[in-house]
Curated annotation (Swiss-Prot):
Protein encoded by which gene: rplB
Protein name according to UniProt: Large ribosomal subunit protein uL2
Positions with biased composition (Basic residues): 254-273
Chain segments carrying region Disordered: 228-273
UniProt xrefs under SMART domains: Ribosomal_L2, Ribosomal_L2_C
GO molecular function: rRNA binding; structural constituent of ribosome; transferase activity
Organism per entry: Rickettsia akari (strain Hartford)
Keyword set includes Ribonucleoprotein: yes
Function, in words: One of the primary rRNA binding proteins. Required for association of the 30S and 50S subunits to form the 70S ribosome, for tRNA binding and peptide bond formation. It has been suggested to have peptidyltransferase activity; this is somewhat controversial. Makes several contacts with the 16S rRNA in the 70S ribosome.
Length: 273
């Protein structure tokens, strides 16, 4: 999809760059595949802020996405491509031959009227879902499972994909966009193609208010706070902080490694760049 620029008839339109969504479905989502979603404002069950800079934003309906693709050997036709406010990628409404509807992540170049299927015998075609052991090396994939039957977890964001680079000893080796090489069981499923909306990385919201519509509050710098609020706070005049960058709780930030999960490190062949 292309990007839209606007004539600067107001200050907020001068820098605004949006993804052109004119080709997407303009109606409401399918009611049976939606449910309400409540806002947390970044607070946990004790009312304390656990995720900073969240709050407000437009009301949303959650679209129930099928990440598992468990309807095996049943063909489905793409009814429409839709916008989803809960994720960066677009979604596709598909209708199976038995009449059931489902939402899936829409890959690039998937069009209305295309047929998709989840099967070990499916063609290597955009939108089809297969176990990794039936997919040829060199194929571009998205929505890749990490545990058999759990549903896709890798490459679900706009424009993302992974490459299948090898198979050996019951595992497939995939290359992620981060440069990481990872092992995934060959029985895990993946979908052919790259995720839609690759131009999202080039958008410019143009004004602070659009960030508020999306549920993001202002991000205050530590050096602009008082000493009681942040290790970088205080000082006379514009002080630069006086120490290496740290979080509000004093832990190093800006590049400090934070990964703690040693249990799955054995599946990482090469760390990300």
């Amino acid at each position: 999809m292309a990007l839209r620029n606007f004539n600067p008839i107001t200050p907020s339109l001068r820098e605004l760059v949006q993804v052109d969504r004119t080709s997407l479905w303009k109606g409401r989502p399918l009611k049976s595949l939606t449910k309400g979603i409540s806002k947390t404002g970044g607070r946990n069950n004790q009312g304390r802020i656990t995720s900073w800079h969240r709050g407000g934003g437009h009301k949303k309906l959650y679209r129930i996405i099928d990440f598992k693709r468990n309807k095996i050997d049943i063909s489905a036709v793409v009814e429409r491509i839709e916008y989803d406010p809960n994720r960066t990628a677009f979604i596709a409404l598909i209708k199976y031959e038995d009449g059931e509807y489902s939402y899936i992540l829409a890959p690039q170049k998937l069009s209305v009227g295309d047929r998709v299927m989840s099967s070990q015998d499916a063609d290597i075609k955009i939108g089809n879902c297969l176990p990794l052991k039936f997919i040829p090396v060199g194929t571009t994939l998205h929505n890749v499972e990490m545990k058999v039957g759990k549903g896709g977890q890798i490459a679900r964001s706009a424009g993302t994909s992974v490459d299948l680079v090898g198979k050996d000893s019951g595992y497939a080796q995939i290359k992620l966009r981060s440069g990481e090489f990872r092992l995934v069981p060959l029985d895990c499923k993946a979908t052919i193609g790259s995720i839609s909306n690759p131009d999202r990385k080039n958008i410019n919201l143009g004004k602070a208010g659009r960030n508020r519509w999306l549920g993001w509050r202002p991000h205050v710098r530590g050096v602009a706070m008082n000493p009681v609020d942040h290790p970088h706070g205080g000082g006379e005049g514009k002080t630069s902080g006086g120490r290496h960058p740290v979080t509000p709780w004093g832990f190093p930030t800006k590049g400090k490694k934070t990964r703690k999960n040693k249990r799955t490190s054995k599946f990482i062949v090469k760390k990300r760049k």
